[in-house]
Amino acid sequence: MRPSQEVPVNPGSHKCPVCGMAVRIIRRADGKADYYEPLEQHEVSNKLDPVDVITSNKLKLLREGKKTVAFVGMALTSCSLAPYDDENVEIWGVNEQHAYEWMKRWDRWFQMHIRPYYTRTFDVPGVKEHYPWLCEEHGKPIYMLNVDEEIPDSVEYPLARMNKRFFSKIRRGDEKVKYYTSTMPYMMALALDEGFERIEIYGMEMAGPDEYVAQRPCGEFWLGMAAGMGVEIYLPPDNQLIKGYLYGYKGQGY
């Protein structure tokens, strides 16, 4: 399979050598590179390539006969590679990504933030107002922290049920552990609870500084939970999740 999305970038920008995301190089006074600064969605071309035909056909064969869901986040390396043309796969989206052309269809949505977040004005060129979109009738569930009466498709996320199923035997002292540090774990818990047999993840890298510390360990915990339950996991070739050197075999151990 070919590498993940070759992200088209505007003049003056580059690709991160680690994750492939579009970045701007910040230079010192002497002109030498100092560090990378990630670009925002609107700074990158809205025209991203879909998955190639060969890879698409291979993945369709691997999904055959399996209840499959694709999570789609906003990382530009693979967000457009999701199986939008395979109606046998549920597509679960998040936040304001409905504004972008690569988000061609969806079956369920997740907006797991407090009301001031999703009602705010997005001062981003080309992005449709998020809250008015949420207030439209889509006829599909939008999972939220609580039902919002202004949002006709809003559904309260079944957190108590997820906690009872997945965390009843995990404690820190006398405290029952609850471990969801981003939207992806909520999606994963629901998919596992509903018996999905295959989970594909697109546009979720958790490679940024804020994500890497708090969100990535939790995301990888849930990937491990899924694998332990016998669920198939598919990540695009260059995805940064559950990726590292082989301790002892590659590099010196401790």
What residues fall within each predicted segment?
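Short metal-coordination and nucleic-acid-contact micro-motifs, chiefly zinc-binding Cys/His arrays
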Residues: N10-G12, D34
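Short cysteine-rich clusters marking metal-coordination/redox-active sites
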Residues: C16-C19, E37-P38
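Short, non-ligating residues that shape and space the ligands of small metal-coordination modules
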Residues: I25-I26
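Cysteine-rich micro-motifs
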Residues: G31-N46
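Metal-ion/cofactor- or nucleotide/acyl-coenzyme-handling active-site neighborhoods
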Residues: L48-Y254
